[in-house]
Amino acid sequence: MNARVWSNPLRDPRDRRLPQIAGPSGLVIFGVTGDLSRKKLMPAVYDLANRGLLPPGFSLVGFARRDWEDQDFAQVVHDAVREHARTPFREEVWQQLAEGMRFIPGDFDDDTAFKQLRDAVEELNASRGTGGNFAFYLSVPPKFFPKVTEQLKKHGLAKAPEGSWRRAVIEKPFGHDLASARELNAIVHDVFEPDQVFRIDHYLGKETVQNILALRFANQLFEPIWNRSYVDHVQITMAEDIGIGGRAGYYDGIGSARDVIQNHLLQLMALTAMEEPASFDADSLLTEKLKVLRAVKLPAELGEHTVRGQYAAGWQGGEKVRGYLEEDGIPASSTTDTYAAVRLNVDNRRWAGVPFYLRTGKRLGRRVTEIAVVFQRAPHSPFDSTATEELGENAIVIRVQPDEGVTVRFGSKVPGTSMEIRDVSMDFAYGESFTESSPEAYERLILDVLLGDANLFPRHQEVEESWKILDPIEEYWATHGRPAPYPSGTWGPEEADEMLARDGRSWRRP
């Protein structure tokens, strides 16, 4: 049963320069009272409407344990939009959007609530022309996925009417190891077909992450040297300057490696290392990313080539901050990692012998995410060693956040009568090169869900391959001591510097 694809007969479907507009549809958000919904999802929906990318009859349904009427829910969305939306508030856009808002109060095991949800969907089909097309956004902890999907199936909400579609959107974490990820996938796929399931990794919605593919495959400049013959190593960093905040209950059972490396960083690595896809579609991208993940080889000595850390008290932004073990809700015996660094190799012809260093952490020097492709030094130099002693390694650095852009670092002669060569940088910054403002990641991802475009969503195979990489590291850490402490505001434990020093390298200072 194929869902009818909404298309403009006057437009070439291959022309992707103009944004596509979603066809008749609605979005149901479970867990609509949470931070993610309030700060990201609701503002993204409004911003899409404000840009004219949602259909006039678009509908938004909230489901949560609150004794609210539809107008109470609309007020909550209104406040969230006013506070967090990227685009200016326009009353006429808001009024049209608000007319399609409905709220269903109830628990996930409440049959009456799901009957109300089914009735609301049918009413919106009739009053707003949503055409039976609905996406169900599970903005809830994974432990609730089985119950929510079971209820959707039980009440006929997962099955689309003839010519319509139903889709499920789920947020990370996609399990906490390979076994739980497989169990989760089986539960979701029992109700929805794999191509109906959209797993959100918001990093893949960021402009600079998508630009990795453009940078590599739309230019002749970079790809010929994007291999082991020229690249010395690759560093992928996601650093945060904040602590865990109020997320102790969630974070203490997970840690930084499971929270970030398993999804964001391995996805960035796959995009950096993959071969050119046959075309820019979801299946072709999946094929090439899977090849990379399946070629990843763990170091033989995990103790030497992986490091975990835990932030201690220190100074951050001019303020004294607590260590992880002093945070509210964290037991003094916790061995949860707030910093993780690993060395991985991609065992194929392009990358054999090139290490990929992945690191992430909280309470580090600054908030930054970047991919640095660091090149080998020139095999021969005609200059005296004194002329090049301040020359570092050439690098292409893709800045994912903040200050999105690309930096190319190379050596140049210092003005003067002598020959002295130092590092200089050429910078491309999104904010300076384009007048268009970049949409938030969730804008792009929600629109893609409504369009059925799965290019930017990890499939279940990628999730499982990522856990196969991380699980042996987590198992090793579980039986080998405690995380190394590092003062807040620094760049992680000394052991991480020593890990690279053993390879004759050092971490970049972003």
Locate predicted features.
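Secretory/organelle targeting and membrane-embedding segments
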Residues: 1-170, 174-510
